[in-house]
A protein has these predicted regions:
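His/Asp/Glu-rich, glycine-adjacent segments
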Residues: 1-82, 187, 194, 229
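Structural recognition of the beta-strand scaffold that forms the well-ordered cores
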Residues: 66-70, 117-119, 166-168, 219-221
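Metal-dependent active-site segment of extracytoplasmic phospho-/sulfohydrolases and closely related
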Residues: 94-138
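Extracellular/periplasmic catalytic domains that process cell-envelope and extracellular macromolecules
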Residues: 59-63, 110-113, 158-161, 211-214
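Active-site neighborhoods of enzymes that stabilize oxyanions during catalysis
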Residues: 152-238
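Extracytoplasmic/secreted cell-surface and envelope-processing proteins
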Residues: 77-79, 127-130, 176-178, 229-231
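Short secondary-structure boundary/capping segments
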Residues: 2-4, 83-86, 132-138, 234-237
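Active-site-proximal segments of metal-dependent phosphoesterases and phosphodiesterases across multiple
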Residues: 81-96
Length: 238
């Protein structure tokens, strides 16, 4: 195995020693892992090239029963530039080439006919042109305080992830009153698709706070073209 980590020391110490020896003998530059990771997007194609060379070696040499490989280029470039951009199309083409090379390796190894290929992603992308900042509204209502980019005091806060946000109310004594107030205010924000209370969490596959203490007190969903930001800076909620 080779772990999916940046740090060179961990990358090598947690890898199978005999595999590292084989890769070095083949001239695959595993010593570049951390250097290329630190380069950000500029190092993504190099990393995918190296990971594919490693996969080819494992397939042709060891004929594994199962092999998983993480290609990073498409995710990184679409995060940086959005969908339907020249960079995104280039990244998709690059990853297509890497998948083709892996398939060709199974043919070379004589296991193609008995191999199932699964190409999957952990998430998709939606292009947005506006950001909703629920923590700005919470700050304006006196429910949190910030110092520069940092939130330093909070009675409530929003944890955001793309087109969704989870609002946690930490003021237990006034939780119901605050939840009702925030529900009404969040509904009025342009770009807000839904403000969901715990009684309706089943509709989005979310456990209630009673079922899981890590669950939020309100769940927010953005309309197409909008994304959530966790920033509490500024005066504009959108």
């Amino acid at each position: 195995q080779l772990p999916d980590v940046f740090d060179q020391k961990i990358f090598e110490s947690a890898s199978t020693p005999s595999l590292l020896k084989e890769l070095r003998a083949k001239g695959i530059p595993i010593e570049k892992q951390m250097e290329w990771c630190k380069m950000g997007n500029a190092g993504k194609a190099q990393r995918d090239w190296m990971y594919t060379r490693i996969a080819e070696h494992i397939i042709t040499t060891h004929k594994p029963n199962f092999l998983a490989i993480h290609l990073v280029t498409v995710d990184s470039f679409e995060h940086a530039t959005g969908r339907n951009t020249p960079e995104a199309y280039w990244a998709c083409n690059d990853s297509d080439n890497r998948v083709r090379e892996i398939i060709e390796a199974t043919k070379q190894a004589g296991i193609y006919e008995n191999t199932a290929f699964v190409v999957a992603a952990d998430h998709g992308f939606i292009t947005y042109t506006n950001q909703i900042k629920p923590n700005v509204l919470l700050r304006q209502r006196g429910l949190l305080k910030s110092a520069g980019p940092r939130i330093v005091e909070q009675k409530a806060y929003a944890q955001v992830q793309g087109g969704a946000a989870m609002v946690y109310i930490l003021d237990e004594a006034n939780k119901q009153r605050i939840a009702k107030q925030l529900k009404n205010e969040f509904k009025k924000i342009p770009g807000m698709a839904a403000v969901i209370e715990p009684k309706d969490f089943d509709s989005v596959g979310q456990l209630t706070p009673e079922d899981d203490p890590r669950s939020p007190d309100l769940f927010l969903s953005a309309k197409d073209g909008y994304s959530f930001s966790g920033s509490a800076k500024g005066d504009d909620v959108v």
